[in-house]
Each structure stands twice: as structure tokens, then as C-alpha cells.
Amino acid sequence: MVEKVKHTNEKKIRVGVIGVGRGQSFAQAANEVVGMELVALCDRWEERLREVGQRYGVATYTDYEKFLEHDMDAVILANYFHQHAPFAVKALEAGKHVMSETASNTTLAEGVALCRTVEKTGKTYMLAENYPFTVFNQEMRRLYHSGEIGEVTYAEGEYNHPMSPRDRLRISPGMKHWRAWLPSTYYCTHALAPLMYITDTIPV
């Protein structure tokens, strides 16, 4: 049973979500139970945007610049894979905190620009890599830091997500989808993130 979090001295975090496909999971989760309030949605998919906007009763935008003018504290990026870094930079510069789906950036230059913008604005940026927060990875972190498994000197990570052809087509329709053209070695967050989270180290 989920208990409602008490926020007696804290105001709700007003959140806007860009992307009404994958982003719907974030829109649903941004509620008062976790001290958040969904206030705006943004997408170029007008039909779906209108449908989801009506469901949640929030403002909708097809223009990202206008979306950023909305009165909100944070932006959740669930748009296209290769768009995250430039969209995050714009949101940070607009005074918004940012949580971004993976990947954070697709080039080193984008990564540098993103880090510099975070430092310049002082706003919070979070990469929403979800796999470290599964129950078994949480337990592995506990075991590692408690010393119950001894001293760890080497670790590797691998992630496999078996899916039926029907499910693959459902989440990755057509050759223009990023999963169809992106080299698999570019998307290794589920393999590396748990290791980094469990050990508090950076892979080499």
C-alpha cells in the first residue's frame, strides 16, 4: 500500500513533460503522492497531445519555446533519443530543473555543453536511467556497501531484454525509429548504470 507523502512545509514541484508517448508514464507519476503537480505537456503529435492533455486537464504546447515559458519548476524530457542534450540545455537556460530520459547526449560536444550549462545555471539535472532502481540492484548496492560480499576488484555488466517481434514493432515502429539506426554499442546504459550505482565508481 502506497502512503501519501506529507508535504506540510514544501510546495509541490510543478512539472512539464515533453513527449506524450513514453512521457505518459512520467505524466502519470507526477502527482501529489510524490509532491509533484503536472502542469503542462509538449509534443508535435497534435492528436495524441490533445487526447492526453484533456485526460490530465493541463496546458498543451506544440512549440517547445512557448512550453518553456509556462510557470513550472522542472521539465521531464521523454522526446526523441537524439534530442535530449539540446532540449535540456534550453530548459536549464530557461531556469528549469531537468530530468532526461536516456541518452543524455549523443556526442562529446553535447555532453560538454550540457555539463557547462548545469554549472552555469546551478539547476539540477538528472539522467533518468531507471535500471539501477530495480529491487535487485538496490539489494546489490546494499550488499556491496555493507561488505557482505567481500572486496570487489572487477565487475562487468550485461543487459538482455527479450521481446517478441510484435512487441519490438510496437515500441520501435519503422526504420526511422532510433532503435533501428542507432548502433547497439551506443546504448549500454542498462549494462553500465547498475555497476556505477552499486559501486559509486566510473567504468574504465
Which residue ranges define each predicted feature?
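Short, Asp-centered acidic motifs that coordinate Mg2+ and/or phosphate
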Residues: 40, 74, 154
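Hydrophobic residues in well-ordered beta-strands that form the structural core
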Residues: 62, 99-100, 125-127, 156
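N-terminal Rossmann-like dinucleotide-binding module
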Residues: 1-56
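Rossmann-like NAD(P)(H) cofactor-binding subdomain of soluble oxidoreductases
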Residues: 83, 103, 126-132
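Predominantly a Rossmann-like dinucleotide-binding segment in NAD(P)-dependent oxidoreductases
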Residues: 21, 131-204
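Rossmann-fold dehydrogenase core element
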Residues: 113-130, 150-154
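Beta-loop-alpha module in the N-terminal Rossmann-like domain of NAD(P)-dependent dehydrogenases
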Residues: 56-117
